[in-house]
Each structure stands twice: as C-alpha cells, then as structure tokens.
Amino acid sequence: MSTLQLKETKVPSVQFVGDDDVLSHILDREGGTKLKKEKAQLLVNPQKVIKKADCELEKSDLEVLEDQNYVKVLGRNIQESLGNGSAKDGRNKVYSFQQRKHPEEMTKLALELAKTSGKKDPLDSNDPEITKNIAQKSKGHSTSEKAPLVNNNKTEFLSTQPHNLRKRIIASRSHYDSESEYSASSSEDDEEATKDEEEDTNVARLSQKSQGQNRLLPAPVSKETLPKKKKRDKASDLVEEYFEAHSSSKVLTSDRTLQRLRRARVDQKTLHNLLRKFVPSFSAEIERLNQQHEKLFHKWMLQLHLGFNIVLYGLGSKRDLLEKFRTTMLQDSIHVVINGYFPGVSVKSILNSITEDVLSHVGTFQSVLDQRDWIINRFKEDSSLELFLLIHNLDSQMLRGDNSQQILGQLSSLHNVYLIASIDHLNAPLMWDHAKQSLYNWLWYETTTYSPYTEETSYENSLLVKQSGSLPLSSLIHVLRSLTPNARGIFRLLMKFQLDNQDSPSYIGLSFQDFYQQCREAFLVNSDLTLRAQLTEFRDHKLIRTKKGTDGVEYLLIPVDSGILADFLEKEEEEA
C-alpha cells in the first residue's frame, strides 16, 4: 500500500499553461535575477532608431511622427527592450547609477508637456506599467553608450529634435556655453532646472546630456574668477621677485676709476707732443676734405665784403681751417684773432685789443659800453679802416652771455668790420634772437673736418693732465653762479681784499675775525657760525684755503691767480 502511494506521488501531473506564463517563467529562471543585479537600463539612441525606420517614410512624415509620438513612447516598452538587449546582445554594457530620489518627476514632466502642447495625453499616471518603466529609465540614465531597441524584428521610433526647433536649440546651447564654462548643478538641480524651462522636451534632453558630460569635469569655476586669480597670482609673483632682487645689501657700483691707476699724470706739453705723434688711419680722406673747404676762401672774402658775416659749423676742430684762411687771405689786412676757448677771454679783453692794438688809443674808459661806443664812432668816422675778426668758438662759456653777444653783434654790423667765427655746440644758435640774428647777418657753412679738439680742450680739467692747482676763470664763474647772492657777496669781499694787498710781500691772508667783522658790516652774516658754514662750502669747491699763522690765528686765502680774479671782477661789473 505504501508502495502504491509512493508511485502515485511520483506520477507527474499535466496542466495547460499559456504563452505569457511560459515567457514570464523563463525570464524569472534565467535572466530575471541577473537583470536586476547586473544590468542597467539601456539608453535609446534616437538617431540609430530613425535610420532603421521604414524606407518608404519621407523626411517630413518622420518629423510629424516624431512630434506626435514623442509623449506616447516616453516610458513605454522599456522593459521589453531591456529584456531583448540584455539577453541577446552582450556587447551593450551599461554602468548603473544610484537611484534618483524622485523617480516620478519624469512622469509629471511628460504630463505637463502634453498639456502645454495642446494634445491629448495618452499616458496615465495611475498606470503601474508606465510608472515602473519610467522609474527604471531614471535609474539607468546615462550618456556614455547608446543602442537601438529591437523587439521581434520591429523597430520602435523614439523622438529626435524637431526641425522647427533646431535653430532655437542651437542658440540656447551656445548661450548656455557662453555664460558658464563648467556646470555646477547636481542631479536634483538638473531636474529642478528642467521643470523651470518647460519650453520643449528636446531642450531638456539636450541640457541633461551636457550636464551628464560635465559631471566628469573638475570642480566648477567661473570664467570671471579665473582671470582675477591669475592677475592676483601674477602680481604677487612680481612683488616677491622685486624684493628678492633688492634683498642683497651689496653695492654693485664699480669703483674702478682712472684715479685708481697708480700712474703719474703728464703735463700739458707732454700731452701735446704725444697727440701730435698720432696719425689717423684716414688722414688722406681728411686732407681731401680740407682741400674742398679751402676752395671756398675766395667766395668767403667776396661775401664778407658784400656785408655778410660767416659762421662755420660741423664735426671736428675748425681752428686749423681758420688759421689757413688767415695766412692765405689776410696777410695784408688788419685782423684780430680771438681764442674763445681760452679761460681768461672776455669782451673787455677783446675791446682792449681793438682800442690799443688797432686804433692805438691810450687811456681808459668808464665802462665797457663807453668803450664800445667809442670804437663804433671811430669806424664810422674813418671809412678807410677795415678790421677782420676771427673768433674761435664763439659759443664758448666765456662769450655766450647776452651782453657779450650783443656787443659783438653791434661791432659786426659795421660795414668795415668783417667777422668770421666757428661754433661747436649743438644748441649754439639758441644764443641769438631775431635782433641779434639781424645784427650778425650770418651765412652758414658746414665745414666738417673730423680733426681732434686738441687746443680747445687743453684748458679743461682732466684726470690725465697735471694741473697747476688754480681754478680757471670759466670754472670760477660756473661755481659762483651756483651759489646764493649772500655767498657771492662774501666771496667778493675776500677777493677785493686779496687784490688790494697782492703787492704786499708779507700778505699771508685775511684773518677770520677781521673777515667776520667786514661781512657783518655789509649785512651778509649775523653770526660766526653762519660764516663758518659758508666757508665750508667754499672749501668744498676749492675756492679758498685756510692756514694758521705763527700766532695761532686762522687766515683765509683764495688759491687763484690775481689776473683771473681781476678778470672775474670786471666781468661781474659788466653784467651788473
């Protein structure tokens, strides 16, 4: 009995099952669990689906079909496509993302878009199949891979961008890219931004794709902040480099000067002999150039007699050229040569040479202006008198004064006085205004000689030449002009006292107390401290020298030649 019962239990029972039950049983047994664990939802490639559409459909029909079926196909038949794609084709690998917190947002979005488009919504939010498909779609949302969906050799059409909205989509995308280089929104912010747009689902899908790609980029940074940060970093680097460059306390100025050369300085005569032995490599060219200038001598003589005066300019010393003109053309004429580069030259010395050597006048004049008027009247009275004035360096330091140029211009304006001069300074024409230009009545000649300024620079201070120790007149004038009027008055008192006692053999200088008393009486100082401060400045410029006598008294002395001091006083009186 027990054996029969066991056999009866082992007999299989037969039951009729439908095709749907068989299909669900196969999916549960073979791929159902794997689908839930390993596979994520495959995204739909609208472009590939459209390419597999019926060839008989035209482009315009496809666009109408896409506009009409966009909401209908949203969320439908996703489960079937997943089953086909995962079971049959193993090449489509999709990586799953975390489940969204609000999976029903896509359904609400579809309903709102259907209402705004004015079409009847074919979707029902209460349909469990639609809700399930949309939820699965939100879980498997990805833009990395796209695959076509095939179900029983039937192609399902999904929507693409409508033709009439294509331009607006491109414009919105370009505007979006111009506003921000990177996207800073999360998945929840993307859904909220999609609800705010509510213009077209294609625009929403396009923004979702761009946002999904931008999630792989680094932290969001605004375009406007990047240049500011770069500028700040660059400015900070420049500041650091500046302080690093100036952090060293070492002085980089070199002290290798000519004074460090332990060689005895030569005198002026030895220097002249050395310079004469030097022969330039282009001496033949210089000789030809001088010959061209010498051909103009007769022309210059003609223009001088026509009432013009001649000024020579150009690179190089013109002393030899004027000397050649004097020896060639002025042998039988009365002429006076004036070396303007000489430190002791002045208008007074020029007028003295004319009155004493040319006009043979014996006597003195009250002022330089009286002497000038006497010379002008003498040449006007005797028209047979002719005088040639040759001035080297008319623009020298001693002759460039306004009074000196005015007197020389008045002499050159006489019809029987002929002037030929040379200038070397670049700004020499600035000495003459329109009035002086009309007095001189210049004819300009460019006479470049390329000769060295040997004689012109022989009276200047040099580190190579040993000087006598006394200041030349030009240096004395230059130093005193830089002082205050009180300082010049103090120095003038000491200079007059020294000139008055220059013939005394026992003169050793002016004592400090006597000098202070004279300055106090002239209202130049009010205390001995002020006088000592001024004497310190004179001592720095090497204008005075102090020494103590046998009685311990301090004496003051000017280490300048008496002739230079006398010329300086005359020049001061002329300018006064």
UniProtKB/Swiss-Prot annotation:
Placement of Involved in LRWD1-binding repeats on the sequence: 1-100
Cystine pairings recorded for this chain: none
Compartmental location: Nucleus
GO CC terms of this entry: centrosome; chromatin; chromosome, telomeric region; heterochromatin; inner kinetochore; nuclear origin of replication recognition complex; nucleoplasm
Pfam families in UniProt: RecA-like_ORC2, WHD_ORC2
Keyword tags: DNA replication, Nucleus, Phosphoprotein
Compositional bias ranges of the Polar residues kind: 150-163, 204-214
PTM annotation (Phosphothreonine): residues: 116, 225
Region (Disordered), start-end ranges: 112-233
Compositionally biased tracts (Acidic residues): 187-201
Gene Ontology terms, MF aspect: DNA replication origin binding
InterPro entries: ORC2, RecA-like_ORC2, WHD_ORC2
Keyword RNA-binding: no
UniProt GO BP: DNA replication initiation
Assembly and binders: Component of ORC, a complex composed of at least 6 subunits: ORC1, ORC2, ORC3, ORC4, ORC5 and ORC6. ORC is regulated in a cell-cycle dependent manner. It is sequentially assembled at the exit from anaphase of mitosis and disassembled as cells enter S phase. Interacts with DBF4. Interacts with MCM10. Interacts with LRWD1 throughout the cell cycle; this interaction, which occurs only with non-ubiquitinated form of LRWD1, prevents LRWD1 ubiquitination and hence stabilizes the protein. Interacts with POLQ.
PANTHER family recorded: ORIGIN RECOGNITION COMPLEX SUBUNIT 2
Function: Component of the origin recognition complex (ORC) that binds origins of replication. DNA-binding is ATP-dependent. The specific DNA sequences that define origins of replication have not been identified yet. ORC is required to assemble the pre-replication complex necessary to initiate DNA replication. Binds histone H3 and H4 trimethylation marks H3K9me3, H3K20me3 and H4K27me3. Stabilizes LRWD1, by protecting it from ubiquitin-mediated proteasomal degradation. Also stabilizes ORC3.
Entry's family note: Belongs to the ORC2 family.
Protein name per its UniProtKB record: Origin recognition complex subunit 2
Species name: Mus musculus
Encoding gene (name): Orc2
